[in-house]
Amino acid sequence: MIFRSVSNTDFRARVRTLLLAGSTALAFVAAPVWAFSIDDVASKAKDLAGDKYSAPTSNLPSEFSEMKFADYQQIRFINERAYWGKLKTPFKLSFYHQGMHFDTPVKINEVTATTVKPIKYDRTKFDFGSLKFDENATKDLGYAGFRVLYPINKADKQDEIATFLGASYFRVVGKGQVYGLSARGLAIDTALPSGEEFPRFREFWIERPKAQDKQLVIYALLDSPRATGAYRFVLRPGKDAVMDVQARVFLRDKVSKLGLAPLTSMYLFGSNQPSEQHNFRPELHDSSGLQIHAGNGEWLWRPLNNPKHLSVSTFSVENPKGFGLLQRGREFSRYEDLDDRYDLRPSAWIEPKGDWGKGTVELVEIPTPDETNDNIVAFWNPETQPEVGKPLDFAYRLHWTMDEDELHDPKSSWVKQTMRSVGDVKQKNLIRQQDGSTALVVDFEGPALKDLAPDAPVTTQVSTDSNAEVVENSLRYNPVLKGWRLTLRIKVKDPKKPVEMRAALVDEAQKPLSETWSYQLPADE
């Protein structure tokens, strides 16, 4: 039996009614008489969608809203005072203080077997360092967001494994991982001239876990000028962190582009787009490419770029089996960064549940001068949008992993790396001379290639758009990888326009031996 959104008084009254009904009636009440579910949140989301949008208001004193980042960093949550700290559950909660642009509180509630109660702001849970402020001004401030703590790396140490902070952003890590890319609840009109709308999680409900629980359940209410939504997250920590997401979205008004299961990452430079300035780090990115597993079984890999101009790429898919932003290549020598450890940043893989129908996986690449800006976005854009006020239900599993080999077709092969340089031709005197072309070197490896003889009849299928001429298409065995290396040299006709290319390895019967390499050479490069 489910009673939604009941107060403690209502709950006690209903229990009292059941008791008065006698022992016969009680015999039928074996399960708890109250439970919280996504339907409770969806009811709130539907009601919100029927009302005019009300923008959140800030209650933050100026000494916090105007502070610099260095000052905000001084505000430290005291983990010894974590929520559920005295309970035997392995999960604990800590909270983000408001400050800078995190200037609007979110409501956070605890759900138990019998009640829902707000988790109230407590200033004594924070160490403010050398900051000076009026303590009375923070009395009813509220939290900006929260973290989930769990002993993921050591049994006696609580590590931060998930964070919900800002708009509808959240990040998760598994064992041995460090924070990298983010996920979001919903994206609206991303990269459109009209401007992007950022929905916001305005309220959370977190189920108090039992001592033996290995998962944490979080509910969230999303709100924005043109959409509302109810979300249920089930977080399972481990070597890979797995999060099951269930959502019900309502539109207040029509949108031009609806982004489901959005991911946000950063790409500054890498082997397929080397840094224009000398840098001891060969690569600097949270993710190296977009991977798609289409409904027809095709696997596609798209290396990321940091373009000079905004770039939007669309990949038409029906009933996608998966897509995500991956960090392929875990060797420390690729990054050489002891501080930020890009080699330990997870990939995020979206595994849709059920059929999502027709639509596109969209990749947005935004120019950025440094690594402080998230400039990569990927999401699913359904071909058919829900009617205003009607629910859109969807669900997916989100994997946060460093084991990218598990995200391939185990019988095929995939791109190990893409390298770009100026093209050249070896002269009779053995000196290489540049010829005005751009060279792309693509290494393929995997089970489909590993056991083939070096002289096996492996060939390529290569295509480009009309803005490029292919002047070299050569394939050779790579004994280091026990795979094959494809070298392409192209001459760009109009440098002000990008070039789209695709390539795959096939056998003598033209049967695919690899995923499809889909590459865009950005404009003005």
Curated annotation (Swiss-Prot):
Keywords: Periplasm, Signal. It comes from Pseudomonas aeruginosa (strain ATCC 15692 / DSM 22644 / CIP 104116 / JCM 14847 / LMG 12228 / 1C / PRS 101 / PAO1). PANTHER family: GLUCANS BIOSYNTHESIS PROTEIN, GLUCANS BIOSYNTHESIS PROTEIN G. GO terms for molecular function: carbohydrate binding; catalytic activity. It is found in: Periplasm. This is Glucans biosynthesis protein G. It comes from the Bacteria. The keyword Signal applies. Involved in the biosynthesis of osmoregulated periplasmic glucans (OPGs). GO terms for biological process: beta-glucan biosynthetic process. SUPFAM superfamilies: E set domains (SSF81296), Galactose mutarotase-like (SSF74650). GO terms for cellular component: outer membrane-bounded periplasmic space. Belongs to the OpgD/OpgG family.
